[in-house]
Amino acid sequence: MTMSTEIAAELKIARLRYAGNEAFVAESPSGHAVVTGFAHEGLSSPTPMELLLIALGGCTGADVVGILEKKRQVVTSYEIEVRGTRRAEHPRIYTRIEVVHRVQGRNVDPKAVARAVELSETKYCSVSAMLSAGTEIVSSFEVVEEEGPRI
């Protein structure tokens, strides 16, 4: 296999079509459509910078859930809050991103959650790896014991 073939095998192409009013209809490499643009009256979709926060949350969330399932943790609810702080001058990049994982379940081991978050942040989440090259990312978690009958 040549070097160019190896690179081409990993190439992903997203296509965006201008839809007017500073909005774009984007098609992901997997064929899903998303509307994005600049926040102003009449646009009811996430901005490109908001999509970065969503991408980070989705990426790390999938990792954490998968790891906790492998560790046989009984998670009944899981929420991620991603908070981004942007600098004032252009380009208005995120300078700090906080990721808060809220895990609820039965006898969930906080050490298992801490390890799952750490593995996602340092090994598995590609979005985190991309963003952490120029942005401070701080992760934390909370475990809430589920009460009542097991589902």
Where does each model-flagged region fall?
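Alpha-helical metal-binding/catalytic segments enriched in His/Glu/Asp
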Residues: 59
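Extended beta-strand/beta-hairpin segments
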Residues: 1-54, 65-151
